[in-house]
């Protein structure tokens, strides 16, 4: 199902497959490292591999999205449809697109994943062995995601050539404008009076939830 969602978004079997494959590699490496460290999967952390898979897919999607922007438009997907279509002539080859994607996402990706590692590692202060093992499992998994999504995936993308590039580019342009009316309608809420109404409604909901939360 995850692969299907990625395919519908990227319109590419190759990009969807590479993202899922790198996420699975992160999970397999995590299980192998845990075995080497003398740990295993118990009922407490049996869902951790799925969590690591989801995190890896999320960061992998960012990489393929930037890669696709480079091979379609030669940069970020910013500007009007006509501007993006005109930038199609600046599209780069897969090798250069992978290099640019790696350079742009390496630092923010590492910072984000290291923050996740620190967050999971902080759970180890709880003096319960099963909880500490859960923290170790998640920390190792997120750390390995740095290698799979920020190093392995760009290398694989550098060898990836997409077919029907012009058709995929036009489809992406339609994707970018598909929800313009929805965003235009929601942008009304950014005005002072509608924004104040939203804040007031949120305050009422918070107070209601706080009152009933004490009874749980």
Could you describe each region identified by the protein language model?
Residues 1-216:
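Membrane-embedded transmembrane helical bundles of large multi-pass transporters/channels
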């Amino acid at each position: 199902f995850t692969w299907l969602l990625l395919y519908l978004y990227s319109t590419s079997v190759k990009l969807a497959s590479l993202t899922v494959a790198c996420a699975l590699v992160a999970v397999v490496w995590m299980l192998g490292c845990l075995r080497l460290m003398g740990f295993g999967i118990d009922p407490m952390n049996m869902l951790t591999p799925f969590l690591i898979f989801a995190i890896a897919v999320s960061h992998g999607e960012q990489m393929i999205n930037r890669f696709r922007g480079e091979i379609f438009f030669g940069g970020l997907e910013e500007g009007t449809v006509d501007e993006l279509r005109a930038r199609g002539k600046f599209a780069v080859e897969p090798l250069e697109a992978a290099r640019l994607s790696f350079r742009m996402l390496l630092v923010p990706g590492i910072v984000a994943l290291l923050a996740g590692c620190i967050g999971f590692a902080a759970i180890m202060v709880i003096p319960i062995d099963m909880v500490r093992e859960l923290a170790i499992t998640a920390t190792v998994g997120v750390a390995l995601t740095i290698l799979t999504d920020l190093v392995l995936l760009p290398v694989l993308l550098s060898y990836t050539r997409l077919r029907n590039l012009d058709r995929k580019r036009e489809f992406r342009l339609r994707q970018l404008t598909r929800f313009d009316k929805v965003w235009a309608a929601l942008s009304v809420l950014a005005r002072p009076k509608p924004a104040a109404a939203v804040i007031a409604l949120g305050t009422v909901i918070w107070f209601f939830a706080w009152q009933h939360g004490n009874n749980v």
